[in-house]
Every structure is written in C-alpha cells, then in structure tokens.
Amino acid sequence: MKALAKLERAPGLTLTDVKKPEVGHNDVMIRITRTAICGTDIHIWKWDDWAQKTIPVPMHVGHEYVGEIVEMGQEVRGFAIGDRVSGEGHITCGFCRNCRAGRRHLCRNTVGVGVNREGAFAEYLVIPAFNAFKIPPEISDDLAAIFDPFGNATHTALSFNLVGEDVLITGAGPIGIMAVAIAKHVGARNVVITDVNDYRLELARKMGATRAVNVSRESLRDVMADLHMAEGFDVGLEMSGVPSAFTGMLEAMNHGGKIALLGIPPAQTAIDWTQVIFKGLEIKGIYGREMFETWYKMVAMLQSGLDLSPILTHHFKVDDYREAFATMLSGESGKVILDWTAA
C-alpha cells in the first residue's frame, strides 16, 4: 500500500510502498479517505531535535484521519464493516491506575499513532477497536479528519466554565482558532486571541473572535480597555508555547483566574511566580483528549451549530503532499487536508 513515511534521518517524507498491516483479534482496519497535517507532522518533516529523539526510522507517520472499516478482528464488538470512523491517536495500556479509573488520557504508558507506531498517512490503518470512534453521517470527512486537533481545542477550552466569562487565547494556530469558536459557542463573553501571524488572526476573526490582536503592533492592555475590562481575563488558554505569550497572559489574568496550558514552552522557561501566587491562579496542563468525553462533546457541538468550516483552508491529493506540506510550513493556512481516495 502507499504511505507517507520517514525513510531516512533527514528532513522530508517520502511517498512509498509499505506492507499492509495485519489485524489482531481486537483491532479494526480502516481504509483511509482523508488525513490532515498536524504541527507534529511538521516537526517530523523538519526533523528537529524532538523528532530525532522520538520518531523511529523507517516508519509511516500521521495521526489525523477518517476512513471506513474494512476488516475487524474476531473479538471486536460494536462496529460493522463499512462504518465511517476516526479514532483516538493515543493508545493506552488499560492496566495502569489512571486507565483503570477511567482517566485514560493520563495513561503513563501511552503510545502515539504516527509517532511511536505506524500512522495514518497510508491507504490502511490498524488500531485497537477501543480507539475507533463512529462519525455521524451529517459530519463531513474533512471535519472528521481534524477531530484529533479539534479534540485538543475542546479539551483545553472546556476545562473550565466559560459561560459569561472573558477568555484570552494565546497562539492562533489551528487549535487556538478552533478554541475561539468553541468558547463563543458555549457562551463566553469576550474572546480575545493573540499572535503575530495576520493570516491566522483573520481566520480567528472569521471564527468569532471578539478581538484578534497582533501583539507586535497592538497592546493587549489597550484592547482590554477598549472592551471595558477593568479586572482582567477570567480564563486563559495558552496554545503557543511561547514564553512571552505566557508571561503576558499571567499579567492579564484577573485574580482567581484559571489557565489551561496546551502549548509546550522551553524546559527552562522562567515566569513571575508572584503573578500566580498573589492572584491565586489555577493552572492546568492539557494533554490529548479525554477518552471519550471530549469526542462526544465534539460531536454534540457540531450537531448544535458549531461551524469550523473556515479552518479547512486547503485540500490536496496525496500525490501532491510536498505542496501540501509547503503550504502548512508557510504559516498561511488553517488545516491542510490530504485526499487518499485516489491513492
């Protein structure tokens, strides 16, 4: 079968032929129809320090996808051949304390699809049936293919009550932009997002941001004054991993505010801890998606009118993957979709 693989320890990926995976007793085989390019895939493409330490070579990668079940193991229940599914990319052990307590997103033995094991940039993917998630017919393949990052945005944004609250989002990547739409959908008052990328800030405006602020030209304090925010933001969603963005967020938070951290800052990042302590801030780290509460919430929000269509900006056939990755690398895109139906 065709697959996009890391074949050598160097930048780039290669469209190549690999062996079709085998189905275990508790697995499903999915014929892939659409995939999306993630920021993780960009790290793998660039072959940066993280990728060099993490990604086995050779291996085909990718973890944002949708497809159709074409084969099932003999122990699988609850699915049928022909079911349209996406799937949870974190494969958990099922036996550690957190897994047994229903907190699988906190499994200490997590294995990542397309990171630690063969991924979804291929004609076929095999995963445990437990990880597969049926997609309702009214949700398009393109939207279903981005459930992984949509889930990151959902997990982060819904970590705290947003009804009537003022929300600051730092980082207008696709996940931050989707968090804008989620926050507005569930009843936030002001949703302000910051970045230095004008293209993506404009996407955030289309998704409902009250203000999309280029912090290289505009002061967040001035924006708060324009919005008559005398006390600061109630909730912060840090999506960038940029130390200066997190520092600015801490300064802009109201006393008693709550912050969810999805972005990964450098290991030695220093912050002003007096902002955290004297303001009584609550900070929560976010990893992946809650299994499977986040997935049910994603479907429910789409079915109740959440519109994510502006984030789907570019579509390519898989044979044009180099152009697709160049588009993503340019920074002037939302989500980039790869079509595998002609592979």
From Swiss-Prot:
Write out the entry's keywords from A to Z.
Cytoplasm, Metal-binding, NAD, Oxidoreductase, Zinc
The entry's Zn(2+) 2-binding residues are: 93, 96, 99, 107
Compartment annotation = Cytoplasm
Q: Primary place of residence?
A: cytoplasm
Q: Which GO terms describe its biological process?
A: L-threonine catabolic process to glycine
Q: Which residues form the active site?
A: 40 (charge relay system), 43 (charge relay system)
User: Example GO molecular function term?
Assistant: zinc ion binding
Gene Ontology CC, one term: cytoplasm
The record's listing under PROSITE patterns reads:
ADH_ZINC (PS00059)
**UniProt-listed Enzyme Commission number(s):** 1.1.1.103
Record-linked InterPro entries: ADH-like_C, ADH-like_N, ADH_Zn_CS, GroES-like_sf, L-Threonine_3-DHase, NAD(P)-bd_dom_sf, PKS_ER, Zn_alcohol_dh
Tell me which residues bind Zn(2+) 1. 38, 63-64
Q: Where is this site: Important for catalytic activity for the proton relay mechanism but does not participate directly in the coordination of zinc atom?
A: 148
The record lists the catalysed reaction(s) as: L-threonine + NAD(+) = (2S)-2-amino-3-oxobutanoate + NADH + H(+)
Q: Which domain of life is it from?
A: Bacteria
The UniProt entry's sequence similarity note says: Belongs to the zinc-containing alcohol dehydrogenase family.
Q: Which HAMAP family match?
A: Thr_dehydrog
Subunit structure, interactors included = Homotetramer.
**Protein name as annotated:** L-threonine 3-dehydrogenase
Q: Could you tell me which species this protein originates from? A: Paraburkholderia xenovorans (strain LB400)
Encoded by which gene? tdh
